[in-house]
């Protein structure tokens, strides 16, 4: 019989119950016991949903109050020593301080989990890091599930992935792989504690196998699993997010009891494991997207596998369901307004039922679930033929693009002369990245307008009042290129998604980004186009209030793609180019309306990089082409800006230069301008604006600090190509500190301009 198991479930609840309880606890509105009770209830509900899908094993150990990698840092005693906490007796309060910081220590750094939009807390390893086992987190959840009469499989991230996703810290140079011999016995202790608590199978996740691991890391798998296999539970080694076919010989030789492979992201890898002689777990339902599967098609893959493997075939989702929203059935508005689209979707609970149907079809024959299979086929057929998805005009526009459609009319050297002729900017021109503080009044007006409690005219008046204030304050500060402040925008992707065709939105489609922060990504379900102008009215109103140049503000095609649930029936590159052409319509309309400085934000270009470097060039080529398409056809005198914020540029600088924006602004203040050195060494050809202060903190920098950063920038970038700006948008800041911070920036700029003029 085929076995059905789960690897992980969303933690936050169907209606973000965990988020609201956490935040109440942080505000001291509920007790620790009340928070623990909410969490216990959510875990129980999750397990019951898995059991209702006829699962042979429910997942335990996947639930966390913040992040599963933070749980592992606690379980292995690897929490940062700088906090002075005892990992053996860590309170919940201290656990949250590790994640959020306290008055003495900054929070543990966060970064994206592989190529997902989930953030984990990065382990800090020192040459002298000592490990100590504390299996309480995993054992407690196992015992809770057992008390409900459920068969449970604990899930733990493996030792090599744990070390891989960490960072080396401290003054002594070392390779974190050298900590493995100290870490392994601690893992053995944790696994033994689970065996004692009654675990029959333990899942050990090693997604690091899907990236370009150095040879010595790959070699280490032999010793690690030779050691872990001595534990008297069966081990399922789980891989996901990509192919591990290149490691097939190694994986087949490891003394584990089973292997999980992701057949959604990498269906082609099945051939490499067809002769595997132990349990093979097939990840056949997408754990990262929201589309209903065509179950007949899935069965075409797994039925031959079952014939070959018999009882050794297990089935599951491709990875943990953490990355999908909880329950489609609560989306009543979507069901009423877009019934077809509703029928094409599957959230976590629907995916559990898809797996139930597949298990039944494999074990009892397709006839036992004929009705469910017919419904799945009908949804797939309707989606394949829908005129709402497939639009001839969009397809024709893409197909008819001439060669070099993504190129500006002239090279940068000519464009910058045409731009400076009318802009007439001083040395070290100043600007803002885009947004200004989103006050309570702005949020209330937007919410009231959405609920129908505020008329369109009153809403527009409220937004115009905010725009006028933003323009006035920038003029008082003597900024050179102004922004309108984006008061009308709730979110930089959602705002555009609501105005483009081919997008849809949910009410409760939340997924965890980190800790208590959840995001509700738009759904790109069909061909994308722009029915009418999206930003022109706001930007032209702002421009009417000032003689200084006003910057139009758009979110770039790659970022819109990366931060959405994307259709899976055509290549992502095609979707991205469709978005680019829709944005290009907006760019040309802004230009026509007299807005001749236009920013196209691309904070997510780096996030889209594939896990394997061999695939980078193809991605960077279409991502760069999409950006250029969005600004193509502009006059030379129109200045295109872009903004990016991340900590690593060196390896993709040629691709960033190839985007050919006239001005790029980047986040650099927290790295003391280190990032800029890469641009200098690369001889980045166009204008550049390194952030001179950190907007993520309410702290007002001193003039000396800003001057230090600006002088460092002048050493690296020719001063005639240097802009001055904050690190990022000011949406999350208060007005008081915003004005004080900008005043410091302007004072330093005026001082250095005077000095350079001598």
UniProtKB/Swiss-Prot annotation:
The active site is at residue 696. Its cofactor is Zn(2+). One of its GO terms (biological process) is methionine biosynthetic process. It catalyses: 5-methyltetrahydropteroyltri-L-glutamate + L-homocysteine = tetrahydropteroyltri-L-glutamate + L-methionine. GO terms for molecular function: 5-methyltetrahydropteroyltriglutamate-homocysteine S-methyltransferase activity; zinc ion binding. It holds the Pfam family Meth_synt_2. Zn(2+) binds at residues 643, 645, 667, 728. Pathway: Amino-acid biosynthesis; L-methionine biosynthesis via de novo pathway; L-methionine from L-homocysteine (MetE route): step 1/1. L-methionine binds at residues 433-435, 486, 601. The keyword Ligase does not apply. InterPro entries: Cbl-indep_Met_Synth_N (IPR013215), Cobalamin-indep_Met_synthase (IPR006276), Met_Synth_C/arc (IPR002629), UROD/MetE-like_sf (IPR038071). L-homocysteine binds at residues 433-435, 486, 601. Binds 1 zinc ion per subunit. NCBIfam families: met_syn_B12ind, PRK05222.1. Catalyzes the transfer of a methyl group from 5-methyltetrahydrofolate to homocysteine resulting in methionine formation. This is 5-methyltetrahydropteroyltriglutamate--homocysteine methyltransferase. It comes from Neisseria meningitidis serogroup C / serotype 2a (strain ATCC 700532 / DSM 15464 / FAM18). The gene is metE.
